[in-house]
Amino acid sequence: MLAGCFNLSGYSYKCNSLLHHQLPITNYQFSNHQIKSSGEVMYQEDIYNSQNVKKINNEQVDQIIKSIIAGKYSWACVLLLRYSGYNPIDYIPYRTYIRLLKNNCLGGKNQEGRNDSQEVLI
């Protein structure tokens, strides 16, 4: 049985390699995750990530669903990022983000009126 440890970009990794039927199986532990090179992946709850992610309430979920139904998938992504506690600017180009804000926040009241009139016609 071979065992070793190494450090890469601030994370400590443990590596255990076993020879079984001439097929090496390597286990890697990434702090709270364990991944086997044989293709089997075992997930453990990552305490760090669960502390950073906010819970989304029902009203916020409704807004996301309404934007998806309206075909505004990019805006749904912005809402999902926002409500989860992430900054959308970190994931979306600045110009795109500003355009989405203008179309959905500033012009949102005008567009809602248009959608209501369209729903009546349909």
Swiss-Prot record:
Annotated knockout phenotype: Single deletion, no change in heterocyst differentiation, in a double hetP-alr3234 deletion no heterocysts appear before 48 hours, by 120 hours only 3% heterocysts form. A triple asl1930-alr2902-alr3234 deletion makes 50% more heterocysts than wild-type (although they are not active for N(2) fixation), while a quadruple hetP-asl1930-alr2902-alr3234 deletion has delayed development but makes wild-type levels of N(2)-fixing heterocysts by 72 hours.
Record field: transmembrane: none
Alphabetical UniProt keywords: Heterocyst
Superkingdom to which the source organism belongs: Bacteria
Keyword set includes Nuclease: no
GO biological process: heterocyst development
Induction and repression of expression: Transcription fluctates after nitrogen stepdown; down-regulated at 6 hours, rises by 12 hours, decreases at 18 hours and rises again by 24 hours.
InterPro entries (UniProt xref): HetP-like
Coiled coil: none
Homology family: Belongs to the HetP family.
Role: Delays heterocyst differentiation and commitment when nitrogen is limiting. Interplay between the 4 HetP paralogs controls the timing of commitment to heterocyst formation and its duration. Epistatic analysis show that the 3 paralogs act upstream of hetP to delay commitment (asl1930, alr3234) or inhibit development (alr2902). Asl1930 and Alr3234 must also attenuate the activity of Alr2902. Ectopic expression does not complement a hetP deletion.
Domain notes for this protein: An internal segment (residues 19-108) complements a hetP deletion for heterocyst formation but only partially restores nitrogenase activity; it does not bypass the requirement for heterocyst differentiation master regulator hetR.
Subunit structure: In bacterial two-hybrid assays interacts robustly with itself, Asl1930, Alr2902 and HetR and weakly with HetP.
Extra remark: In Nostoc filaments, approximately every 10th vegetative cell terminally differentiates into a heterocyst specialized for nitrogen fixation under nitrogen deficiency.
Protein name per its UniProtKB record: HetP-like commitment protein Alr3234
Organism for this UniProt entry: Nostoc sp. (strain PCC 7120 / SAG 25.82 / UTEX 2576)
